[in-house]
From Swiss-Prot:
This is Ion-translocating oxidoreductase complex subunit A. It is an enzyme of class 7 (translocase). The lineage of its organism: Bacteria, Pseudomonadati, Pseudomonadota, Gammaproteobacteria, Enterobacterales. Keywords: Cell inner membrane, Cell membrane, Electron transport, Membrane, Translocase, Transmembrane, Transmembrane helix, Transport. One of its GO terms (biological process) is electron transport chain. Belongs to the NqrDE/RnfAE family. The complex is composed of six subunits: RnfA, RnfB, RnfC, RnfD, RnfE and RnfG. It is found in: Cell inner membrane. The gene is rnfA.
Amino acid sequence: MKHYILFFISNILIENFILVKFLGLCPFLGASSNIETAFGMSCATTFVILTSSVLLWCVNFFILLPLDLIYLRIIAYMLIVSVSVQFLEIVLRKTSPILYRLLGIFLPLITTNCTVLAIPLFSLYEHHTFLESIFYGLSASLGFALVMIIFSCIRERIVLSDIPLPFQGAPIILITVSLISITFMGFKGLIKI
């Protein structure tokens, strides 16, 4: 159990996909203008990553490997992600129209989010078991959500601040992201896996 807890903490704080691996920057910068949108995007991304991780592991080990069709892994995975996102879009449209409108174009773009594409593939290439694959997907997506929500809170404060003209817009956003990244670097020596 200790292994899974360390695995969980490591993926959330130390090996964060946004701040360390620089994956998922498009939705991170685009959907983090307010806390509601960031939280909705985080929940949607977590759902898609978790379901995709589980389904890809099952498809890989029960269909692709036994039939020696490993070369179809990426195509199968794109299909799994597309179905997960489409299912999520239908559910959100019916249950939460406000969140559906807030997410706007970013909801279908989850399909091409490099974080969503990378996490299950990293899990497969690191030869995780089924349970490790679930933990990897959940912890990596929670790390994505944590950074996204923290950044959206800071970004809401930035809008209210008096920023010098040369730093308004993208410059202050990128400076803020770099400072958050430096903060998370403080966790680097915390866990050795």
